[in-house]
From Swiss-Prot:
Superkingdom, natural source: Bacteria
Source organism of this protein record: Campylobacter jejuni subsp. jejuni serotype O:2 (strain ATCC 700819 / NCTC 11168)
GO molecular function, one term: tetraacyldisaccharide 4'-kinase activity
Matches recorded under InterPro entries: LpxK (IPR003758)
Pathway involvement of the protein, from the record: Glycolipid biosynthesis; lipid IV(A) biosynthesis; lipid IV(A) from (3R)-3-hydroxytetradecanoyl-[acyl-carrier-protein] and UDP-N-acetyl-alpha-D-glucosamine: step 6/6
Cystine pairs: none
Biological processes, Gene Ontology terms: lipid A biosynthetic process; lipopolysaccharide core region biosynthetic process
EC number: 2.7.1.130
HAMAP family: LpxK
Name used for this protein in its record: Tetraacyldisaccharide 4'-kinase
Gene that produces this protein: lpxK
Family recorded in the similarity comment: Belongs to the LpxK family.
Length: 308
């Protein structure tokens, strides 16, 4: 458990707040970053452009890890009717296309969908959720099931799909502008020019979270960049960070509660969907995003193009 925590913190520090030795490592790995960038760029070419007759919106980011894509996708679904979410379904134990939710009915298990897809499935305003490695097939299935708008979670690099690309920029930026493994970027930073809209935190959207202080709670989370929850660390008796998408085990969580003489798990909804059947008392950290007019109006303008 401590290894998981140390691993996550080391990665966060390496990409965002590196010490002297981590900076040295980043420069040593720079040749690999150049090679990675070359193949990443190559992968964006030589594919036929696919155009859909209904709105397709992509919410993505250039950097490694979470920047708030999930709450932003949820925020879009709250603003517009008939939204289906299509995503890869990272860390799911299934392959191919799965309809996770259709018209408010959940149709598969957590292991088939993955944690992010199941989190979307519990969102009332989202009409459908589909996981598919092939995003084109996922989009086609969504429109077949009656979607009015498809929102793609983490599909900025899918340049063969004609879509409205929203690129998220968090207040917390990587220390270096390098691609992996020297930096946190999955594509070279100049690729941000290919976005239709760069959404800046504070200007185009507001991020907020809430949870009541509970001295009888242990905060556990398996999200990318757990330091996003820093304001809530003092609200629990102890905090434990695991790798993104980590599969919690009931016994280890029981041991954590016993160790700190607590009776409640404090976690995000993404974490909750993985432990909800364990029978623990849980306290949810609400993570939400509110769209500002600048972003809301841009999306409305794009959607209206399909109404003509």
């Amino acid at each position: 458990m401590n290894e998981e925590k140390n691993y996550e913190l080391w990665l966060d520090n390496y990409f965002f707040k590196p010490n002297f030795w981590q900076k040295c490592l980043a420069f040593i790995l720079l040749p690999l970053s150049v090679l990675y960038a070359f193949f990443a760029i190559l992968n964006t070419f030589f594919r036929k452009k696919i155009v859909f007759k209904k709105p397709v919106i992509s919410v993505g980011n250039l950097s490694f890890g979470g920047n708030g894509k999930t709450p932003l996708c949820k925020a879009i679904a709250r603003e517009f009717d008939g939204v289906f979410i299509v995503l890869r379904g990272y860390k799911r134990k299934s392959k191919g296309l799965f309809v996770v939710k259709n018209q408010n009915e959940i149709l598969c298990t957590l292991t088939q969908s993955g944690d992010e897809a199941m989190e979307y499935a519990f969102e009332e305003n989202i009409k459908g959720v589909i996981v598919s490695e092939d995003r084109v097939k996922g989009i086609e299935k969504a429109f077949e099931l009656g979607a009015k708008i498809v929102v793609l979670d983490d599909a900025f690099s899918k340049f063969h799909i004609k879509k409205f690309d929203i690129l998220l920029e968090s207040k917390i930026k990587p220390y270096f502008n390098f691609t992996l493994p020297s930096g946190a970027y999955r594509l070279p930073k100049f690729y941000e020019k290919r976005a239709d809209f760069i959404a800046l935190e504070g200007r185009d959207f507001v991020r907020y979270s809430f949870v009541k202080e509970n001295p009888k709670a242990v905060l556990v989370t398996a999200i990318a960049k757990p330091f996003r929850l820093y304001e809530h660390f003092i609200k629990a008796r102890a905090c434990y960070f695991f790798k993104d998408h980590y599969e919690f085990k009931k016994e280890e969580l029981e041991n954590l509660l016993k160790k700190h003489n607590c009776d409640t798990l404090m976690l995000t909804f993404k974490d909750f969907v993985k432990v909800k059947d364990f029978g623990f008392k849980c306290q949810i950290i609400e993570l939400n995003i509110e769209l500002k007019d600048s972003l809301r109006e841009k999306i409305k303008t794009y959607i209206k193009e399909f109404e003509q």
